[in-house]
């Protein structure tokens, strides 16, 4: 077996992103909504509930900018989801596979927090402890159990920063 050197074409293709994070892919729309949104925002929200709804369902802004719809469906469901997030309650999107639950949650997180990457992928092997934090084992061995040895999970980071955390496949946990 001999390794062939990478060509410029191969290196270029390896650097391509398959799918950008939502807040990157739709950055222009989110920025236009931010600029034209003078409505009241809940604490730590980047957009008002009205703007989050427009971002998901699409529409034309006062300045003529067209926001593309991300969700084609019942408007009332989106309004209820956004209103729920504006309270101190959690939002559970429940349904059969292929009904855009992950898609909607990713866009909600991007519009509300400006960050859709606070994600925990549920598996049968994840414990309640792992939902909150992990351990830096090198630090744990060197210094023993301490705050420095803890590695915060996406859920813990979201709570510290006041952002939306998403848990995918909750029923597997």
Which residues are covered by each model-predicted region?
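AAA+ P-loop NTPase catalytic core and its hallmark functional loops
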Residues: 6-173
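Long, compositionally biased low-complexity segments enriched in polar/charged residues
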Residues: 1-2
